[in-house]
Amino acid sequence: MLNKRNPQLNAHGELIHLLSIEGLPKAVLTQILDTAGTFLSVNDREVKKVPLLRGKSVFNLFFENSTRTRTTFEIAAKRLSADVINLDIARSSTAKGESLLDTIANLSAMHADMFVVRHAESGAPYLIAQHVAPHVHVVNAGDGRHAHPTQGLLDMYTIRHYKKDFSNLVVAIVGDIVHSRVARSDIHALTTLGAAEVRAVGPRTLVPADLKHMGVRVCHDMSEGIRDADVIIMLRLQNERMSGALLPSAGEYFKSFGLTEEKLALARPDAIVMHPGPINRGVEIDSSVVDGRQSVILPQVTFGIAVRMAVMSTIAGNNA
């Protein structure tokens, strides 16, 4: 039986779908982060396998392009011993006009156990979760501007790995926040986990004003936004989602909001720099920072496998 207040949870408060971080209790987030820690060592084994999803079929449905997310989901499922099916959307019946729900119905008839879904339309994973059988689980791998919960969780794992505790942290999220599903997921996770201060930093055209109602400090000046920050999360400009001229030029944007070593010096000396990728060097961040000692961008990718293993194994073990 589903939880009437949150479709991601069953009546016992256990996670059965991961659709958004918003509304999830701190205990659920902490459980996933703790579980991810136990899976991290699997990456270093000679045989990188555990049998938790043996006999289960995981369908990766990516209606938008992806490198890191799709690959790490596939690796994570295979390391859990699942059978992984990657649907080629461009060559599928979807490209011939088949509806999303008809596609899901047909794949469900093939005894799918889990759908990992990335879609351009916000809410698509919610729609799928409403129409699958009780034993089938749905993981949101990014839907429109709405949410990217596994990226949010791996960002939280990265922060916890390097900073241990959220309670005294100042976290600055810099860039195209208005179009970013990662920013939304990170903000919900950070506030739930008790970060001391969350800042949204960017030009007025790219930072939603309503973030203030979520307890987020909005800064339109880069120096103010990253001063004394413990964590800086850089975001790319999502030009594919922009409908008009929101910025004068990429060069002007970099001058005002690009992270350079000079600007990074305003943050705390032990601050870490994160980025969900893909990175546009020289637009939102300088190469010297990407490759510098404070960058933890590549460890984020490594942690992503363990976090996605934790998500899939957690929801697969819970029944609706």
Curated annotation (Swiss-Prot):
GO cellular component: cytosol
Name of this protein: Aspartate carbamoyltransferase catalytic subunit
PROSITE patterns recorded: CARBAMOYLTRANSFERASE (PS00097)
Domain of life: Bacteria
GO molecular function: amino acid binding; aspartate carbamoyltransferase activity
Organism whose genome encodes this protein: Methylibium petroleiphilum (strain ATCC BAA-1232 / LMG 22953 / PM1)
Binding locations of L-aspartate: K96, R181, R236
PANTHER family reported for this sequence: ASPARTATE CARBAMOYLTRANSFERASE, ORNITHINE CARBAMOYLTRANSFERASE, MITOCHONDRIAL
Catalytic activity, reaction form: carbamoyl phosphate + L-aspartate = N-carbamoyl-L-aspartate + phosphate + H(+)
Purpose of the protein: Catalyzes the condensation of carbamoyl phosphate and aspartate to form carbamoyl aspartate and inorganic phosphate, the committed step in the de novo pyrimidine nucleotide biosynthesis pathway.
Entry's EC annotation: 2.1.3.2
Entry binding sites for carbamoyl phosphate: R68, T69, R118, H148, Q151, G277, P278
Pathways per UniProt: Pyrimidine metabolism; UMP biosynthesis via de novo pathway; (S)-dihydroorotate from bicarbonate: step 2/3
Subunit structure: Heterododecamer (2C3:3R2) of six catalytic PyrB chains organized as two trimers (C3), and six regulatory PyrI chains organized as three dimers (R2).
Family statement: Belongs to the aspartate/ornithine carbamoyltransferase superfamily. ATCase family.
Pfam hit, one: OTCace
Gene Ontology BP, a term: amino acid metabolic process
Keyword set, alphabetical order: Pyrimidine biosynthesis, Transferase
